[in-house]
Amino acid sequence: HVHTRYSFDAFIFGTTASPDDAYKYAKGSPIKHPLGFDMQLDDPLDFYAVTDHAAWLGMIRAYADPNSKPGQLDFASDLHGLNDPENLNTNTFTKRAGLFASLISTELVEPSKNPLKMLGAYLNEDTIYGTAAYDRETHQSAWRDIAEAAERHNNPGEFTTFIAYEFTSSGPGQSNLHRNVIFQNSKAPIQPFSIVDSANPE
């Protein structure tokens, strides 16, 4: 499965490629590895789907931008400029691994202190909206970009694309099962369903 800059893990570990970049790569164009070298397929593919993590889709990239609304949250300062060119090197791996571990276990799941936001989350049965770190517009904008990129690059009979995302829930011992949710047409929801909504894939 394929991740872009919108997946929390991919962005933390240096991925800056967009969904458009991913589709161009699948069709045979070179793409830049986070460490600066080019990668290219030996043969173009016939079909492809960008399957970014539904959970926190687009959020880590937003935290890294100090000018964005999510980037102004207190914990986000550690992420500012994370994937600026001067920081894309092996010297930042330890920092990235630490950020990955701390974000997943603490900041991203802290409940919001805004009572109106919490009420809205409860009334709409929208769990993710009730967390302090979540910004609906950022999340939906990333998903919209993924869906629109799939539509732009879809050329049936030559190169087939699918709107898709990854749903992964953790089990005992932090084991997990990756599920790629793939839509058969352009009728996708306004935002993907993730483990933050429910750990039950059914």
Show where each model-derived region lies.
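Extended, charged catalytic domains and RNA/DNA-binding interfaces, predominantly
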Residues: 1-202
